[in-house]
Amino acid sequence: MTQRVETNIVFNHGYNFYRSDKKILIEQGGSRSGKTYNILLWIIFDYCSIYSDKIITVTRRVMPSLRATVMRDFFEILRKYELYDEENHNKSNSEYILNNNIIEFISLDQPAKIRGRKRNLLFINEANEIDWESWQQLIFRTEGKIVIDYNPSESTHWIYDKVLVRDDVIFYKTTYKDNPFIDKGLITELERLKETDEEYWQVFGLGERALSRTQI
């Protein structure tokens, strides 16, 4: 996999994280910052090009959301770079084999899979949607590293209180300004929030934690 790949800064975050001694990479960010897409690019073009015979779990709270977002992006990337091979795609199990690595897509409404086999790399998309118990079940079965991304749309959350404070975490915050590929029309719509909705601008424009009601 030596072809030219268009990435943004989030890809570099993943590259540097995996070569560090930290266990958890946290990608907090606003809308359209390219978090999810570039984490997938990193998994495909860095992690899977170096390693083989690994199990990579990509998860979100419910399967419809998983299919409509991160799964769609994953297969779009494979097809864009001519890596997709239908023989490697187990559609019934939502798995794909890449360089002898198994990439499995599971949702938290599949408890048997959550409590199933161990994995080497875990990516939780929109991690703020899941509860503390689900997080614990996932990390107990992850032998390697963990990547999470989310929009900080809650003013309080276990991620802030129990994960960000760990000493084995690398934290990044990104916004639409970190994504050179964003459509100009989307930039205009996001920047309208400055005048129309301060709370939405805080979260989806600036990638900052939502204000509590006492702060508004």
Give the role of each language-model region:
Residues 36-52:
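Walker A/P-loop NTP-binding motif
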Residues 179-216:
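ATPase catalytic-site recognition across NTP-hydrolyzing enzymes
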